[in-house]
Amino acid sequence: MKAKTITVKLDKCCYDIIIGSDLIAQAALQIKSFFHQKGPHQKRLAIVTDTNVAALHLETLQAGLSANQIHTIPIIVEAGEQSKSFPVLQTIIDKILAARLERGDSIIAFGGGVIGDLGGFAASIIRRGMHFIQMPTTLLAQIDSSIGGKTGINSQYGKNLIGSFYQPQCVITDTCVLDTLPLREFRAGYAEMVKYGLINQPHFFEWLEKNQKEIFSSGPTRVEAIARSCQFKADIVARDEYEAGERALLNLGHTFGHMLETATAYNANRLIHGEAVAIGMILAYQFSAQLNLISPMLVQRVETHLKAAGLPTQLQDIPGELPNAEMLMTFIAQDKKVSNNRLTFILTHGLGQSFIAKDVASDAVLTFLKQKFTKTH
């Protein structure tokens, strides 16, 4: 199958998202073109990856690069959200500086969303900005986090509170790598795909309802779903690179979702990002229904679809105890979307009719969360 190319067009730069099969082995064909742009230069780059991806795919990537006389410095970190931390970031930076990579050299972020965020953030601050390439290996990273330039790490006070906007040179998306992805991780990425339909593409959501089984199987329908999702994300980023307006819609489910990730201390045994987003989207829809913006029937429809994909949708689906509603509210207060101590949520008027709700009353959110806890006990 011929690779698809989607171009992200921004005010100051543009870059391609290349989607196809067996692109890891062929990545050097794309990457070496960036070295030619720099003139005579020893071809060197760092590969930031995690233990899981390294075991499965690093040798294939390095072999292809080596065959094209590109020297690589692999930097392998532990898999999981807990690696999005200052100590791990420091380790990556130290290894890149110790290898004497220059500003004109590149960093490949070869992994899921955690690696993309870590590698991109490191690239943005080392020598005031190195080049970097996204090579996403999870569905979530392929359709969402690798596109748009958001990078960063977590804090004890909340998720993604330390970071930068920093665009890659390109995104190389090998759909074959998804065949080795654990089902739980694929489901988590699917939650972000559903999110795009819920934002402002009701026809896409309906298409997902009809094609969910095919998307979970390797084949052309999966590739189409990935390409459509990437195009949607690319279009929004092109219109609003720094999240001054419309791009905030991409945070549907994320205010509640980040709250839950912080509450579970980023413990993947309890909750991973896409699962948090799935629960967060249902909470956003339930809150919208409580405000009489939508009918409970629509909430049920969306929840039924997420459940059919094997995703959690309720607080009680999270293993272990959660903090009380008051403590959860303190996590929401640290959310990046808070402005002048006013809460901002992405809510909805209907299927594909999401909107940015500013000045949401904190008392209303607290009451809503207390009701959720009452129902779980």
From Swiss-Prot:
Single Gene Ontology MF annotation: nucleotide binding
**InterPro entries for the chain:** Dehydroquinate_synthase, DHQ_synth_AroB, DHQ_synth_fam, DHQS/DOIS_N, DHQS_C
What is catalysed by this protein?
7-phospho-2-dehydro-3-deoxy-D-arabino-heptonate = 3-dehydroquinate + phosphate
Q: Name one GO cellular component term.
A: cytoplasm
Subcellular location(s) of the protein: Cytoplasm
Pathway info? Metabolic intermediate biosynthesis; chorismate biosynthesis; chorismate from D-erythrose 4-phosphate and phosphoenolpyruvate: step 2/7
Cited function: Catalyzes the conversion of 3-deoxy-D-arabino-heptulosonate 7-phosphate (DAHP) to dehydroquinate (DHQ).
**Family classification:** Belongs to the sugar phosphate cyclases superfamily. Dehydroquinate synthase family.
* The name this protein goes by in its record: 3-dehydroquinate synthase
Gene giving rise to this polypeptide: aroB
